[in-house]
């Protein structure tokens, strides 16, 4: 369970609620070791593993791959209409393709400030674009900047090379 959880967290930083839930289960187990508590803990671990299975399948349910799902989660906000959610999914997929193409064109992109800035600007410009970017009536200027920064941090962390070593593990696990 712990290995699966760590893989999911490396792929998508917004899955920390699973980490917190797992830590709570383990802490409760360590607190008391009577038979009832142990049985309850194992039942809770089993339910938790089912939740991990569900989270693993969420990308498929959303019609995305794991890489696009991470960007979708970073872009999504509450109270979007179904049409806006579809648009955000399309933005996530297209943005990922754009960023990966840009990274591929720049050797050692993370080693120089100018190339890192270039990737950040690519992300910001894409999100601002009226045809391919975020719905302008749903995202303020500050929200676009915040999401662009969050996506850049995610890209910097998981794409030191292409293909990403974080998502390559998905095929192995």
Regions found by a protein language model. Give the residues of each.
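Catalytic cores and motor modules of nucleic-acid processing enzymes
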Residues: 1-173
């Amino acid at each position: 369970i712990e290995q699966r959880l760590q893989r999911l967290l490396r792929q998508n930083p917004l899955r920390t609620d699973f980490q917190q839930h797992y830590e709570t289960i383990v802490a409760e187990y360590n607190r008391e070791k009577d038979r009832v508590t142990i049985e309850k803990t194992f039942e809770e671990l089993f339910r938790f593993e089912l939740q991990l299975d569900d989270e693993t399948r969420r990308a498929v349910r959303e019609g995305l791959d794991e890489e696009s799902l991470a960007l979708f989660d970073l872009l999504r906000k509450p109270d979007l209409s179904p049409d806006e959610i579809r648009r955000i999914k399309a933005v996530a997929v297209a943005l990922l393709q754009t960023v990966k193409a840009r990274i591929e064109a720049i050797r050692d992109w993370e080693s120089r400030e100018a190339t890192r800035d270039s990737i950040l600007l690519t992300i910001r410009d894409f999100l601002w674009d009226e045809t391919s970017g975020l719905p302008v009536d749903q995202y303020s200027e500050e929200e676009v900047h915040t999401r662009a920064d969050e996506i850049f941090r995610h890209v910097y962390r998981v794409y030191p090379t292409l293909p990403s070593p974080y998502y390559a593990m998905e095929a192995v696990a």
